[in-house]
């Protein structure tokens, strides 16, 4: 079971867009919570892939022999996601489920998240969706100052030598710094246009400068 704020959720969305290009893998950590008493013995947990479009081994790797440690009431189930060019076109999914074994028997399979509507989530299954796509502009890309496009984002990170993850953290890039970055990018593109062989990444698919 995972909580986002105070809300229980049975799904995780992950994108590689904020991960540097040199990094080919990322780990998604799924908390597994015990309902019951902890014991002084480690206990294996039976977690299996039950669906999804991603292929085990090619797109992701599961932990070998997950175990709830002795004395613990929870542990993190860490799935290694593999980066591929296909993720730039569409998302892939993994669906996992906790299954009964000699140590654990499911008692609570769903929990209600909204009493009025009766909306509930599964406590035994979890879906991971991952891609290298943007679902929205980064937190520190101030669209009222300069409209966002993925191409502008990637070019800015490269030219200004800024980690991609910084753009998803408003404490690292203020609106004032963002204004400076945009002015520098406009200047960079203008300088490139004067060259015989300008940086090809300054043009969109129609050949128009992106800044």
Task: Give the residues covered by each predicted segment.
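Short glycine/proline/serine/threonine-rich loop/turn segments at secondary-structure transition edges
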Residues: 85-93
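Exposed aromatic-hydrophobic patches
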Residues: 74-82
């Amino acid at each position: 079971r995972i909580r986002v704020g105070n809300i229980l959720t049975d799904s995780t969305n992950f994108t590689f867009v904020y991960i540097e290009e040199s990094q080919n893998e990322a780990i998604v950590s799924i908390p597994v919570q015990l309902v019951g008493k902890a014991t002084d013995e480690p206990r294996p947990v039976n977690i299996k892939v039950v669906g999804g479009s991603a292929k085990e081994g090619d797109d992701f790797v599961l932990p070998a022999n997950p175990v709830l440690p002795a004395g613990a009431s929870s542990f993190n189930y860490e799935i290694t996601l593999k980066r591929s060019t296909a993720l730039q076109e569409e998302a892939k999914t993994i669906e996992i489920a906790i299954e009964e074994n000699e140590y654990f028997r499911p008692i609570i399979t769903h929990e209600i998240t909204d009493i009025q509507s009766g909306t509930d989530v599964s406590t035994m299954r979890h879906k991971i969706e991952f891609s290298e796509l943007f679902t929205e502009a980064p937190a520190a890309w101030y669209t009222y100052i300069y409209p966002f496009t993925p191409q502008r984002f990637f070019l800015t990170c490269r030219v200004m030598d800024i980690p991609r993850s910084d753009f998803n953290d408003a404490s690292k890039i203020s609106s004032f710094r963002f204004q400076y970055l945009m002015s520098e990018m406009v200047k960079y593109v203008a300088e490139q246009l004067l060259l015989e062989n300008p940086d090809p990444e300054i043009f969109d698919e129609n050949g128009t400068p992106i800044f």
